[in-house]
């Protein structure tokens, strides 16, 4: 919907208690159905957007995790899996593995601190 999700994290940092991970892919060109998809089922090539397994869509999860680390978020990352083109068990497992891979610990020291010594 055009929301800057990284800025949203920074702006509402004190209101975030659970993070819901879900990926989506959207078309780079005009298609038969607009942004809201209307009457078309998920998985229909004429849709403007569709859900994807984590890491297979357009969402920049690296920037999301960095923003969450910046606000010192330590709560859960939950995965909601949806991808009409993939087997459910394989896709959900792949998404779970991806979520574990992208969830890196923030640095315990300031990178630039060594330059001030």
What residue spans do the PLM features occupy?
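Acidic/histidine-rich catalytic cores of soluble enzymes
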Residues: 1-55, 107-111
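Acidic (Asp/Glu)-rich catalytic clusters
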Residues: 7-16, 63-73
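Conserved, mostly hydrophobic/aromatic
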Residues: 19, 54, 68, 77, ...
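Short Gly/Pro-enriched loop/turn and capping motifs at secondary-structure junctions
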Residues: 24-26, 59, 84
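Glycine-rich S-adenosyl-L-methionine
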Residues: 56-63
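A short, acidic, flexible beta-alpha connecting loop/helix-capping segment that sits on the rim
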Residues: 78-88
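Short, flexible loop/turn segments with low-complexity composition
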Residues: 80, 107-117
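C-terminal helical cap(s) of enzyme catalytic domains, especially alpha/beta-barrels
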Residues: 88-109
């Amino acid at each position: 919907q055009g929301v800057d999700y990284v800025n949203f994290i920074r702006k509402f940092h004190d209101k975030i208690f659970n993070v819901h991970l879900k990926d989506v892919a959207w078309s780079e060109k005009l298609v038969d159905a607009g942004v809201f998809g209307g009457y078309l089922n998920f998985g229909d090539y004429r849709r403007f957007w569709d859900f994807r397994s984590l890491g297979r869509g357009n969402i920049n999860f690296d920037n999301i995790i960095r923003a969450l680390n910046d606000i010192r978020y330590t709560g859960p990352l939950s995965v909601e899996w949806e991808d009409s083109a993939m087997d459910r068990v394989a896709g959900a497992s792949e998404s779970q593995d991806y979520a574990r891979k992208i969830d890196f610990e923030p640095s315990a020291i300031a990178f630039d601190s060594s330059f001030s010594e």
